């Protein structure tokens, strides 16, 4: 963490701006009507995804947590009068429960204790609710394995996890597990390409079309 942010104030702002096309692909995967729902965003950073859900999916209320206090301060400021609540926390804050749906984007690969995360999310959901978790940084992605090797020490990363490892943890927690590839239409040519040694556009297209996936972890009704 840098200066109370994940990568620094300016870098976190750029990161959130770059994620718009990913968030919309995530929403295209959701097989439920989100209008009026109570939504949890695990690892919300500056709250951009919940603002999108409030503006475009008409959610009833949104709750986001993140360990970076500077990002949470920004999230509260940027939310304005939207029905959004943000807290600085490493896990689901105490007392947060009754969620109809939960989301995370590139959070699972950061977690040293994946079973505890799965248990916390499971306990926060109502029966029949789903947790949609997107992950591209995993051991089954050649591009991201290289990135992980280059950044593991600086960012204190576990793993990398294999997709089978992730699925196994959530299945053992009690979730019904499904997974799919995100339906990207167009990918901005500059999206994240400066983050890794291999900046070839073909490599990034392969990453987005094949390696970046969304899990659906459903709590039985």
Region roles according to the model:
Residues 106-110:
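Short catalytic micro-motifs in class I SAM-dependent methyltransferases
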Residues 115-127:
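A short glycine-rich, Lys/Arg-flanked "PGG" loop and its adjoining helix->strand segment in the class I
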Residues 1-33, 52, 132-157, 191:
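Conserved class I S-adenosyl-L-methionine
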Residues 103:
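A conserved beta-strand element that flanks and buttresses the S-adenosyl-L-methionine
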Residues 157-174, 180:
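Short alpha-helix
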Residues 145-149, 178-221:
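A C-terminal cap/extension of S-adenosyl-L-methionine-dependent methyltransferases
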Residues 46-91:
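Class I SAM-dependent methyltransferase SAM/SAH-binding core
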């Amino acid at each position: 963490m840098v200066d109370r942010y994940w990568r620094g104030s300016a870098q976190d702002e750029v990161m959130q701006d770059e994620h718009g096309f990913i968030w919309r692909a995530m929403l295209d995967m959701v097989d439920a009507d989100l209008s009026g729902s109570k939504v949890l965003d695990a690892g919300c950073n500056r709250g951009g995804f919940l603002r999108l859900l409030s503006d475009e999916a008409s959610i009833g209320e949104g709750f986001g947590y993140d360990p970076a206090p500077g990002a949470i301060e920004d999230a509260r400021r940027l939310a304005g009068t939207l029905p959004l609540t943000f807290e600085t926390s490493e896990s689901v804050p105490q007392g947060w429960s009754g969620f109809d749906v939960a989301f995370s984007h590139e959070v699972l690969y950061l977690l040293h204790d994946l079973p505890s995360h799965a248990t916390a999310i499971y306990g926060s959901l109502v029966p029949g609710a789903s947790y949609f978790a997107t992950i591209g940084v995993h051991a089954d992605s050649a591009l991201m394995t290289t990135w992980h090797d280059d950044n593991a020490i600086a960012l204190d990363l576990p793993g990398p996890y294999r997709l089978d490892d992730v699925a196994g943890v959530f299945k053992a927690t009690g979730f019904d597990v499904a997974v799919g590839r995100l339906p990207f239409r167009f990918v901005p040519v500059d999206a994240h390409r400066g983050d890794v040694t291999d900046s070839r556009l073909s490599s990034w297209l392969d990453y987005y079309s094949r390696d970046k996936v969304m899990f659906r972890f459903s709590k039985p009704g």
